[in-house]
Amino acid sequence: MENRRIIFMGTPKIASVVLKTMLENDIHVGLVVTQPDKKKGRKQQLVYSEVKEVALEHDIPVFQPVKIKSDYQAILDFNPDLIVTCAYGQIVPKEVLDLPRYGCVNLHGSLLPKYRGGAPIQRAIWNGDKVSGMSLMKMAPKMDAGPVLAQKEIEILPEDNSTSLFDKMAICAGELLLSHFEEICSGKAVYVEQD
């Protein structure tokens, strides 16, 4: 596979599954960007994000800006060909979005434009939806408003809850990215504007 300079940005478990899927399929990630470590529990011990744990297991450098809007020099210095995000947790500035030659793509846990913004998986459960899904989109300065490359539906079963749907979405996200990865990196991806 061509040596591409790829950054992965994400924080929770769903994102760690996507990162693992990329690595297991020989997609070399050269830098991981994730939220800063947080203190948790009564002893206030520092806890790493699930994405950071995967990065460290694979000896991938990790960048953890407190506010990416003002602290993104490490990303500029890396000069990526592609940035892949999934549940990163901060709005990525335009200076970063404009940098990679293949763009910045995001995996979002709903069938956009439905449930733009935070907690899309939980909102599908709360609203009693029968179907949800994953969207692969090109990032834009406005949250979850960029054009969509592909979507994959997931049936929500009566016994599903947020945890089980997160697990389904994580697998779906990795599969969706893999099925369109070469299309993205060849510059042949056709994105469709959202309604």
Label the predicted regions.
Residues 1-195:
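One-carbon transfer enzymes
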